[in-house]
A protein has these predicted regions:
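Intrinsically disordered, low-complexity and often Lys/Arg-enriched segments
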Residues: 1-12, 247-252
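AAA+ P-loop ATPase motor domain of ring mechanoenzymes
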Residues: 45-98, 240, 244-251
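Solvent-exposed alpha-helical segments within well-ordered globular domains of core cellular machineries
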Residues: 8-15, 24-27, 42-46, 62, ...
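Conserved P-loop
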Residues: 86-164, 211-213
């Protein structure tokens, strides 16, 4: 049998078995292991290890894509020194994602431009890296999608999709006042996720001003009652983080 036939068949089998890293690395790694005197078990271990590492990397990539982040940002790139009032240790503790497993919530409060979205994106990325499903949206976009889904009689399916995320990030609550129907739909979604999934909300408004966005004191009170039952508050106050970053880039 030609030496090419086993190689062709092996490539075919590895493709069927969905082992692309095996296919890409087995010859190069075999030569390396031969040089180092590694036995067949060690060779297979290294090959399987590379396949697992690559498979985990692809899974993380798929979760990041499914999350629909507007941009991928990590906490490693966040300049905590620019927002000294932000509790860095609290943020790093949240990055361990144990609060998500406990189905708790996080609310990040602070003026516009102080880095709330960056922190939310960083925590979302950390969750993706730990194997958790994440969804990212703005409050205005979420409400718009729910109203459209309601009009097209697919609201229940959309709500189930939102409820299925281990972590749902709702950015920019408070930037745009919601209609009565929109506020009610948001409340309904928060209620569905209550103690079933973790939710992270960022807002430029303190709690006592949420009525300006939600319209009804009764609805605001009921929503806060659910969202703050098991909650971690991040107070992100200070000068504009975006402005500080812009100045730093120009200075550099």
């Amino acid at each position: 049998m030609s030496t090419e036939v086993p190689e062709i068949l092996l490539a075919h089998y590895l493709k069927i078995l969905k082992l692309p890293t095996f296919q890409r690395e087995y010859q190069k790694l075999a030569r390396l292991c031969a040089t180092e005197g590694v036995d067949h078990v060690g060779y297979l271990f290294r090959l399987a290890e590379r396949e697992m590492i690559e498979r985990d990397r692809r899974k993380v990539e798929r979760r990041i894509k499914a999350a629909k982040f507007p941009v991928v940002k990590s906490l490693d790139s966040f300049d905590f020194s620019a927002i000294p009032k932000l509790n860095k240790m609290q943020v790093l503790e949240l990055a361990r994602c144990e609060w998500i497993e406990r189905r708790e919530n996080v609310i990040a409060l602070g003026p516009s431009g102080t880095g709330k979205t960056h922190v939310a994106l960083g925590l979302g990325l950390a969750a993706c890296q730990k194997g958790l499903s994440v969804g990212f949206t703005t409050a205005a976009a979420l409400v718009s999608e729910m109203m459209e889904a309601r009009d097209e009689r697919r609201l229940l399916r959309f709500q189930k999709q939102m409820a299925a995320y281990k972590l749902l990030i709702i950015d920019e609550l408070g930037f745009v006042p919601l209609s009565k129907t929109g506020a009610e739909l948001l409340f309904e979604l928060i209620s569905q996720r209550y103690e079933r999934g973790a939710t992270l909300i960022t807002s430029n408004l303190p709690f006592d001003e949420w009525t300006e966005t939600l319209g009804s004191e009764r609805l605001t009170g009921a929503l806060l009652d659910r969202i703050t039952h098991h909650v971690n508050i991040l107070e992100i106050n200070g000068d504009s983080y975006r402005l500080a970053q812009s100045r730093a880039r120009k200075a550099g």
